[in-house]
Design a protein with these regions (language model features):
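Sec/Tat signal peptide C-region and signal peptidase I cleavage site
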Residues: 18-23
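Positively charged n-region of N-terminal signal peptides that target proteins for export
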Residues: 1-5
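Edge beta-strand at a domain terminus
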Residues: 124, 133-147
Length: 147
């Protein structure tokens, strides 16, 4: 009887502990994230088999030189250079690359270039965003925003 009781306790511990372990490893990137510099908020969510990221807020939405909304004026493509930054899609082809990790490309509106990118959730409120040119990479940490 003692063996059976011990077996049941061990089984229950394993079964009840599994969801907690999965929650730790299954961190989701979905939500609104404040960039490291605090200048923009990006809504990250699932799309297709990967994730998408769209600018939803700017600290300074008005361009002081024009008095109008900030636009993608660093983009080399004249057709894209007039689109507003708010609503701009930053991620492309972001696909799962491991637990809590996605790889694809990221657009940088500050210089108008697209870079190879890796994104990883390192905690419930921490998103690491990395952009690379060849072997040179830079990264920043975004924090989850309430809105």
């Amino acid at each position: 009887m003692a063996f059976r009781f011990g077996f049941i306790i061990a089984l229950l511990t394993a079964l009840l502990g599994a969801p907690a372990a999965k929650a730790q490893t299954g961190l989701e990137p979905g939500g609104i994230w404040l960039t490291q510099a605090g200048e923009a908020k990006v809504r990250v969510g699932k799309c297709g088999g990967g994730i998408c990221g769209v600018v939803v807020w700017l600290k300074d939405p008005i361009d002081p030189a024009t008095g109008k909304l900030q636009i993608d004026d660093k983009n080399r493509n004249p057709a894209l250079a007039k689109r507003p930054i708010i609503g701009l899609s930053l991620f492309s082809g972001m696909r799962p690359a491991g637990p809590n990790r996605w790889s694809g490309k990221i657009y940088n509106a500050d210089d108008g270039n697209t870079y190879a990118s890796n994104i990883s959730v390192s905690g419930p409120d921490t998103l690491r965003v990395e952009g690379c040119v060849g072997m040179l990479c830079g990264s920043e940490t975004w924090t989850r925003s309430v809105r």
